[in-house]
Amino acid sequence: MDLSKIASTINMRYYSQLGGFQVGGAVSGLDTQSIINAILEAESQPLQNLTEKYEKYELMQEAYTEVKTKLREFRDLVYSFKLQSTVVQKTAVSSSSLLSAEASSVAVTGVYHVKIVQTATYTTLAGASEVVPPPDSTKTFGELDYMYTPQEGTVRLYNNETGNYVEVQVLSTDTIDDIVSKLNSALSSAGITGSVSYDTSTGKISITSDKNFSLVDITGNFTKVFHLDEASLNYSGGNYSFTSTASVSGLSTAKTLQQIATYTSKTIISGKVKINGVEIDVDQNDTLSSLIEKINDSEAGVTASYDYHANRVVIISKTSGPEAITLEDTYGTGLFSLLGIENHSLYVGQKAHLQISMDGTNWADVYSDTNDVEYNGVTFHISGMTSETITVDVRVDTDAIVEKIKEFVDKWNETMDYLNEKLTEESITDKDEEEMTEEEKMKGVLKGDDLLEEIFSRLRGFITYKAEGDINYLWELGISTGDIGTGYENMMKGHLEVDEEKLKQIVEEDPNKVWEFFGGENGFATQLDDYLWELVKFNGRIDQVAGISGRIEREQRFLATQIASWIERLSKREQELWRKFSVMEEVISQLQSQGSWISQALQGSSNK
């Protein structure tokens, strides 16, 4: 008999005391193992009964865990019906895409006339000067390494109307004046009337011509250095124009603060600065990118950025409305001077401003620091400016409320059907236990269970629960067990049906009365939620039966003690049987030896 398998049921470590293989019947010819197993099988019936009971309790615990999960899911929905926002749903429809709206459960219904006076804006600090001023025209091409490392090479100027082109060699030692002169000569050679110029105030090259043309790097990176590779050819008044999209001194954010200081002949010292009173570490070896990241990751409440097209640093508050941005360089690092923001323009953020009227005559001014403005339980979301008066229609969302209540009824029926199934389902008897799935094993384990019967009956009793208020019973909402004929059967099963037309009518009359029925102090959902909570909470009714320290667990511990005792008893019995059969085998062996000796003696006597 396999006692180790039974021991594993209660997580008991079992070691046979027999040791090694037992071989019997060598002398007697008996199948000793089978005989002992048969004896143990007969004597172990009480152990089998205890084990089956233990395993059933284990399945009951699993089944109750599933029941608890189902009731938790049901309670989650029931709890939401205590909230006014669940039952009293309202919708808001705007006449403009520039203003959307959301209506809460307490929103005043009606048509809102809305004027957008001002959107909320962010405080912006913009540097008064470029970070690196444009170089004068005597700078050589090789020195213009603000964003890219200059590479001398060949640039080709195409006359797109004739297909002719002229190539210009750009050398590292060429000054900007030299390059402009070469390009002007190339225009003439390509049959184009026009001019090339460099503006020292903007750091940009401009080309004008009477013919369609293009400029392409064959080797080197002249057009990239002067930001001509991003430029578009414009046509106006019979002339074409082509201008750099950014100053040649526009910076790569990979440049260190020390490198930037070299361009501007300014000084940068490692230390600390304060933005909005928050200290930020500054190291002269910080890159522009890493410095910006430090600022943005700090608690200063601002977002810094560098726009290489404008060649300026901009700092913007993270929250809209009239927020302050303050700069302090108390350690004398020279950072703000280096970045061109020591002198700056400060554009203070504005509050959002709406004018709202319910009658189109009397207007209320409503302000908000953000573009989300609340009024009368309605939140208006501004996404742009318009001079038009916008209408927002706020009304009860009857369909949404009806669908939510139908969802509740569906969940109720699903829960009651599940409980009823667990109470009435039969165990599977046409399969061996080894062939069954866990789900099949659990079938029938809660049939007629006392606690489950109580839960089912209590929930079914809520169908006739009387709530306080203008609506007292479910049937007044059109929720009942059905018409005569089906009503009794549904009542026994705890099954509900919805008269959708009646429910819709009640909701349209006054959705707040519907919510009061569900979510009032003694409302249907309030009382139902309280009962469900008593069932599913830690150490609640279900845990007291099937929890860690519940009745089933205590029963299992008691059974495990009995099972362990029986295993020990049968183990000793098995040893005893093997010992007795071994003695028997030895006696038979001796008798056979004596018989053989007598036979040999008699045979010897007869031969004399």
Curated annotation (Swiss-Prot):
Kindly give the Gene3D superfamilies that the UniProt entry links to this protein: 3.30.70.2120
Q: Does the keyword Iron-sulfur apply?
A: no
The terms describing its cellular component in GO are: bacterial-type flagellum filament cap; bacterial-type flagellum hook; extracellular region
Q: Name one GO biological process term.
A: bacterial-type flagellum-dependent cell motility
Superkingdom of origin organism: Bacteria
Instruction: Enumerate the UniProt keywords alphabetically.
Output: Bacterial flagellum, Coiled coil, Secreted
Q: Where are the annotated coiled coils located?
A: 47-75
Q: Which InterPro entries match?
A: Flagellin_hook_IN_motif (IPR010810), FliD (IPR040026), FliD_C (IPR010809), FliD_N (IPR003481)
Write down the Pfam families for this protein, in alphabetical order. Answer: Flagellin_IN, FliD_C, FliD_N
Q: Where in the cell is it found?
A: Secreted; Bacterial flagellum
Quaternary structure annotation from Swiss-Prot or TrEMBL: Homopentamer.
Its family? Belongs to the FliD family.
Q: What does this protein do?
A: Required for the morphogenesis and for the elongation of the flagellar filament by facilitating polymerization of the flagellin monomers at the tip of growing filament. Forms a capping structure, which prevents flagellin subunits (transported through the central channel of the flagellum) from leaking out without polymerization at the distal end.
**What PANTHER family is this protein classified in?**
FLAGELLAR CAP/ASSEMBLY PROTEIN FLID (PTHR30288), FLAGELLAR HOOK-ASSOCIATED PROTEIN 2 (PTHR30288:SF0)
Protein name, entry field: Flagellar hook-associated protein 2
What is the species listed in this Swiss-Prot or TrEMBL entry?
Thermotoga maritima (strain ATCC 43589 / DSM 3109 / JCM 10099 / NBRC 100826 / MSB8)
Organismal lineage:
Bacteria, Thermotogati, Thermotogota, Thermotogae, Thermotogales
The protein's gene is named: fliD
